[in-house]
């Protein structure tokens, strides 16, 4: 019986083009990449897209400070971000940019459709203005006290403590982040999206299970009051797309940023004719669409975005998967403590697969923060990957190469043990599918323990010294390497480079779930090369000091 291939589109949140990617960003990109690789390993068609979030006053000001046009800054950061994501083995089909003709075209299309439906209206508002810099202040360039929970030093549009969104004029004791001056009020006409028109649609969509229960419950709190209209415009000077037929008005970065997912696929469809844009985005599409995002941008993705898509006649996401923040050694990342670790700095010192594994061992389907404890990181990598997983192969491979010319036995001596490893496939794939990677890793490592216990019990090193035990040595090591093959298939979404090395060592086809059950018997393997290096205690110091 053949199961029909699923057609899946996966996105990760777009990194912002005014700073480097750090290990906090990597939680999401690794989480999404593991899921995509798992789907492909299962034989599903899975496209994976992302891109540079390129617009906003922050980009404009950063570019000015660096003496660059905004376009040049975006191009530079796009190159750096693509390098770092690639370094962590994040396998995007397209890593594009929101500053693109496709994104402009789609933003204008969605805006025009919403306007034609009567969902857009103009209103004169009082806005924060920096009298020193002579610029309207974007939300992120105003700091003050949250009007909802009273947390100090919060952004002008969203509170990182309670998650409230608000307008900058509601902030208590605001100051300009550009000059330190107290902003003055200045009137300006802005365009608003009538989000409240979509209240029932959003309630129904949230109730239908498209979000984790924690996220859905949090969002339902916002419906206790009417949803407020969303300000989708900004005044010049601004780096972004001009609003059609509105002089000196630009789309707010959060309007065109999620449309960047669509633009990235549209651009990919031009490069790859087999990719049909409408098949993934048209209303009523039978394909699957998943967004991986952090908990700080849930409001934009789970309220504004579905409403915009619905109003403009596009499909809604199948699910939005939300993750928590990263802490390092139990605390928020900090430059002064040396725990603000950029992706590039990490890659200068260590294999990306160590961090991919450590994150996988911590990630669940819950919206929980995860902690990168550097001592635990070293211990976990050494104990699990080196001590259990790689050790299994290195204990068996030498005998096969040296004593049997690389030839495996023609049968397995312990078929029941082999079958028991195969019987965990459904459990492990269910854990991957549901984003419970930590549970998958736990099962896989318990299998690695059992495989090593088998080798410990059979003692091929002792058998090799006995007379007439050659066949038994070959059989035991063949069993061990076939168990190692199963473990590698299970770990392949997390450790893609190591899996490739194992395929070369085992001299076999690409490992996947379709060929999982087939053992390698009467088969020649290549000489074993070391797969990973043990981490030294000074690793933590290398990562936390430039």
UniProtKB/Swiss-Prot annotation:
Enzyme class of the recorded protein, top EC level: ligase
Motif 'KMSKS' region in this chain: 332-336
Any single GO CC term annotated in Swiss-Prot or TrEMBL for this entry: cytosol
Residue window of motif 'HIGH' region: 15-25
GO molecular function, one term: metal ion binding
Entry keyword set: Aminoacyl-tRNA synthetase, ATP-binding, Cytoplasm, Ligase, Metal-binding, Nucleotide-binding, Protein biosynthesis, Zinc
Cofactor, how bound (note): Binds 1 zinc ion per subunit.
Biological processes per GO annotation: methionyl-tRNA aminoacylation
Keyword Nucleotide-binding found: yes
Residues annotated to bind ATP: 335
EC number: 6.1.1.10
Catalytic activity, as annotated: tRNA(Met) + L-methionine + ATP = L-methionyl-tRNA(Met) + AMP + diphosphate
Binding site for Zn(2+): 146, 149, 159, 162
Gene3D superfamilies the UniProt entry points to: HUPs, Isoleucyl-tRNA Synthetase, Domain 1, Methionyl-tRNA synthetase, Zn-domain
Compartments, record wording: Cytoplasm
UniProt xrefs under SUPFAM superfamilies: Anticodon-binding domain of a subclass of class I aminoacyl-tRNA synthetases, Methionyl-tRNA synthetase (MetRS), Zn-domain, Nucleotidylyl transferase
Cofactor entry: Zn(2+)
Stated role: Is required not only for elongation of protein synthesis but also for the initiation of all mRNA translation through initiator tRNA(fMet) aminoacylation.
Sequence similarity: Belongs to the class-I aminoacyl-tRNA synthetase family. MetG type 1 subfamily.
Subunit organization: Monomer.
Name the record gives this protein: Methionine--tRNA ligase
The gene coding this protein: metG
